[in-house]
């Protein structure tokens, strides 16, 4: 069963109305629908230390309009008998804000779970909630460690209180040889990465639409996601083209940001030398917090 929760906004979510037009990614089509429930079970078991024995025990959770402004690229699984809640995201970039994103997602999901199960969080009895697991599957082109732990405490303005609260996202680099075990445990995930690898390879030498079409044709011929691609060819084609175009757009924004940051840093160094603060001009090269503070001071 797939549970779709109604829209539930936080105070600062008024700008997220575009989410209603958000389309599912190839990843969600493959692992987040009732029609592909066995795929969901395989992925859940590959990532979980406590396996789920049957697809019927697995509930797929989706939030219709939570915290996203792009394409939905994640799926959530609840195994009710074991009270475990797993959120899995597929990403082509490593975003340091993923722990915050995951925290908001889980807060929404827990809120709806408590309502559905008619739990009383204001009573004297301890309310038990599903044990969370938050996983990010990275398959981008940038080199990255096999496994990374991203912590929400890195975002705290006051780092001295980080031990008081923590929320973690575990990032697996699917392109790293040390994570071949994960692909071996979930054949569909392995085939999904193979499809994406082909699209990436072909788009370097041909337009993205032709690259996607060629990857789809080859994978069908070679038995890679064959039945899925035959059935969902149009959706996958549109989704893949959009996703890879989004990657190009995101890279261009990051490049613009780097160039702007370099220009601002040079301006700041010139101003510091003008004001006789040469010692700070040397420090801002490595001290990010000092650089931010001085940007504000000089209104850059």
Give short role names for the model-derived ranges:
Residues 2-300:
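Elongated, amphipathic alpha-helical interaction scaffolds
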